[in-house]
């Protein structure tokens, strides 16, 4: 998948030092070592595409790539309104970026798919994490999703197994 299901707090806390190369199974892989709730660390594999995006984000800020910046450099920042390239995003800044993106997509869908537009306008940063969990649980074992999301209990992950209203309606109508 292209997403990692990170919490908002993990996204804004993420630093270049979190990007590592580690042995996973029989090969070396790039990963992000996420510092989650309770300062627990979990390791999630990164694709070359994801590494390229992170590298490009740093370069767009006028910094070197992943290999050329101090380890405590935030992975993401808001450069609008005088933002500084070495200052990380705030929770409010992340929310505004995500909400702005959803709003621009909702505007495009307004006439052709008004219900989808309304859903996007109501979406939040946590909705992205929720979407990751729901999608991941259709493809992966619940224990893998639990570990990826940093849940202490499989019952927390299990909450995402509840069918969406639309999915249940479609299934029962068959």
Where are the language model's segments positioned?
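Short pre-functional
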Residues: 1-9, 31-33, 135
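Helix-turn-helix DNA-binding elements, focusing on the entry/boundary residues of the two helices
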Residues: 8, 142, 154
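Alpha-helix N-cap/helix-start motif at helix boundaries, enriched for small hydrophobics
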Residues: 5, 9-14, 145
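Short, basic (Lys/Arg/His-rich) helix/loop patches that form interaction surfaces
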Residues: 95-147, 166
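Catalytic-site neighborhood detector that most strongly recognizes the C-terminal catalytic loop/helix
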Residues: 149, 153-173
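Conserved tyrosine-mediated DNA breakage-rejoining catalytic core shared by Y-recombinases
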Residues: 13-72
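Active-site/catalytic core of tyrosine-dependent DNA strand-transfer enzymes
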Residues: 48-119
């Amino acid at each position: 998948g292209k997403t990692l299901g990170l919490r908002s707090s993990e996204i804004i806390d993420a630093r270049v030092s979190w990007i590592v190369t580690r042995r996973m199974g029989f090969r070396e892989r790039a990963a992000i070592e996420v510092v989650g709730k309770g300062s627990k660390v979990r390791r999630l594999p990164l694709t070359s595409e994801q590494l390229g995006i992170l590298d490009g984000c740093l370069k767009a800020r006028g910094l070197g790539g992943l290999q050329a910046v101090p380890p405590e450099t935030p992975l993401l920042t808001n450069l609008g309104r005088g933002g500084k390239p070495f200052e990380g995003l705030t929770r409010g800044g992340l929310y505004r970026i995500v909400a702005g993106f959803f709003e621009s997509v909702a505007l495009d869908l307004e006439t052709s798919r008004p219900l989808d537009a309304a859903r996007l306008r109501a979406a939040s940063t946590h909705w992205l994490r929720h979407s990751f969990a729901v999608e991941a649980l259709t493809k992966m074992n619940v224990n893998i999703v639990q570990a990826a999301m940093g849940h202490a209990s499989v019952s927390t992950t299990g909450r995402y197994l509840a069918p969406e209203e639309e999915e249940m309606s479609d299934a029962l109508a068959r």
